[in-house]
């Protein structure tokens, strides 16, 4: 398939829950469309975290990818940094006449790319924070409500540090109002992969077995031996948290598999909930059946959203 001239979209997005086959579909479409893949995965940015994050780099072949293996484990990375690097990658790819394909399942990253609003990385203002030492919690809450009049019973008001951080962000955003660069003219076409629940559960379980057999435990051990503390590995998600517990003799091998498998199933449900919320917030997702030939269905969606085809239609 070869789409030419002026498609209605200039960003193709492939999303879906874990183990749904996103990477394979994105790679196949990138080959056909002359595209490059931008990862929307919060953990694949880190080097040497390959098996636990499901990078599947062998599937990419000659297809160029972005935002994978760009940081050392332990370095900070945020949704704000993702949005900045995502926009840089889009500009680079489009500037070379190629099509960017966003692929991943991290909901916050997908939102940051698709909902077309600029995000600010808000630094801590230590001098301003010091000035609040004598300010009572009630006064802090009152100041926050001045920035956010509709705020009622928010979790931001439960803890003093959360209130201070929320107020810090609100002040920063107010100071930056009107200073934003315009968001690029992105016209995304979003394709989601959907599976029957029982089949997705089977795929998740089988993939976990394969990862454990392929050296995931050894990968986590090497990361810890290389200086990444257990607390940081816990932060990097389910696979690293549960394998770390196993390596610290807090779980048996059988419990590792059973508990991690159950946790990943629950995670997939949360991803699906996030995707439904994206739809309610105005993101149009074209769903294809993972078990019914997703590549052919995706081709049809793409052709339906293209002005001109190489066949001359």
UniProtKB/Swiss-Prot annotation:
Q: Which domain of life is it from?
A: Bacteria
Q: Name one GO biological process term.
A: tRNA modification
Q: Where is this region: Interaction with substrate tRNA?
A: 41-44, 161-165
Q: Which reactions fall under this protein's catalytic activity?
A: adenosine(37) in tRNA + dimethylallyl diphosphate = N(6)-dimethylallyladenosine(37) in tRNA + diphosphate
Q: Name one GO molecular function term.
A: tRNA dimethylallyltransferase activity
**Cofactor(s) it depends on:** Mg(2+)
- Kindly list the positions annotated as binding substrate: 18-23
Give the E.C. number(s). Answer: 2.5.1.75
**What residues bind ATP, as annotated?**
16-23
Entry keyword set: ATP-binding, Magnesium, Nucleotide-binding, Transferase, tRNA processing
Can you state the subunit structure given in the record? Monomer.
Task: Describe the task this protein carries out.
Answer: Catalyzes the transfer of a dimethylallyl group onto the adenine at position 37 in tRNAs that read codons beginning with uridine, leading to the formation of N6-(dimethylallyl)adenosine (i(6)A).
Q: Which family does the record claim for this protein?
A: Belongs to the IPP transferase family.
**Descriptive protein name:** tRNA dimethylallyltransferase 2
Q: Which organism is it from?
A: Pelobacter propionicus (strain DSM 2379 / NBRC 103807 / OttBd1)
Designated gene of the protein: miaA2
